Amino acid sequence: MNGASRMTLPRLAVAAVAALALALSLTACENVPTYKQPSLIRVIDASYAAPAVNVTVEGTLIAGNIAQGTITAYGAVPATTAALVNITQATGGLLAQISDVPLAAGSQSSVFLTDNPAAPNGFALGVLQDQQVAAATGHSAYRFLNQAVNTGPVDVYMIPGGTTVANAIPLITALPVGGTPTYINIISETVTLVITPTGVIKPSYTSPPTSLTGGEVRTVLILDSQLTSNPPVVVFTANDVN
């Protein structure tokens, strides 16, 4: 063996240590757990009939001691194809349950508690899929949930500054109670939300002017006003995105 290919004992030791360190490093990398993106979920309580409730998803408490007119912030739960959602009285006792709820990684959903038209003292439970991507540049997305059982169908206006409701075109006409919710995109500007019983201008709910700059995604819950006839409804707005 010539001198160019000969390795001394010290060099062999260094090479062996380096090889061992590399092997341990690779093993450590292989044992790092893979990150799994969670699913985001919240609760929208629109039920007059239901008592104060707690809501758990896969055993995780998402909302505690909430009642009608509440829209909670999103909470994170592990993604799954078959989540179990439990609604219990805040004082104890199971009220309702849904199983096999798909909660995809990175998705946003809402547990939706409503009154049951077929049972005046009962309530219904469902899960809505929420938009998780910002509205297009220069646009805003709105979804309206009509649960104003006594008022019935409503007309929804998004009125630009300087325009009156008499000169405005409804964004939605005759939105039914419990109708299938979809997002509607509008051009972003300063608008006033006005909601009236279908076919009339008064009585109405009128919001303060809202400045929309683009990208907003909102869910608007419409409920009966319990103490007044004018406005006939009350409104709760949640930020889905931005």
Label for each model-derived stretch:
Residues 2-16:
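Bacterial N-terminal signal peptides that target proteins for export
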Residues 19-23:
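Alpha-helical transmembrane segments
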Residues 29-242:
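Intrinsically disordered, low-complexity polar regions and short flexible loop motifs
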